[in-house]
């Protein structure tokens, strides 16, 4: 009986420690960008797929605080979903694709493949981020969260 109680106590302690680990892995400042685009005239579906993989790989390699990245078919449009750890991670992405940034060439190619129709931003974006994106001249729409969670 004593061994059984010891075992149950041990399991209880371990489960509490695991619970704390999962709480620590929440990302409370995550931002999600949903970019609606059209493929540019003259670009085949195969070219779009190949470039999408190329660009996704470049982001994965160069931006450790980009939590996720994916291009998706949406009828005659393309949806790009970008997930960022926080405002700073997104602003770093903006700097990376800007003139002189490590992804400048890739972004020029991006704009050769796609026309951006709108960018919906989900999460609590700071005023600093909202000001940062203005010079890009793209149609950003910000949507603050009422309630959300994101795991690490």
Where does each model-flagged region fall?
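Short S/T/G/P-rich N-terminal loop/turn motif that feeds into the first structured element of a domain
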Residues: 16-78, 85-95, 112-152
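Mid-chain, well-packed structural core segment of small domains
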Residues: 92, 98-110
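Sec-dependent N-terminal signal peptides
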Residues: 4-13
């Amino acid at each position: 009986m004593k061994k059984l109680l010891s075992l149950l106590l041990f399991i209880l302690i371990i489960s509490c420690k695991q619970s704390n680990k999962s709480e620590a892995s929440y990302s409370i400042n995550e931002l999600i960008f949903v970019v609606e685009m059209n493929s540019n005239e003259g670009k085949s579906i195969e070219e779009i797929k190949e470039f999408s993989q190329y660009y996704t790989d470049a982001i994965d390699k160069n931006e450790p605080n980009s939590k996720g990245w994916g291009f998706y078919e949406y009828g005659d449009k393309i949806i790009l979903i970008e997930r960022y750890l926080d405002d700073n991670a997104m602003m770093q992405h903006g700097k990376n694709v800007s003139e002189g940034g490590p992804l400048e060439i890739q972004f020029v190619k991006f704009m050769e493949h796609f026309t951006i129709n709108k960018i919906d931003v989900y999460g609590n974006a700071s005023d600093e981020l909202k000001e940062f994106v203005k010079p890009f001249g793209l149609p950003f729409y910000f949507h603050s969260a009422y309630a959300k969670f994101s795991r690490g």
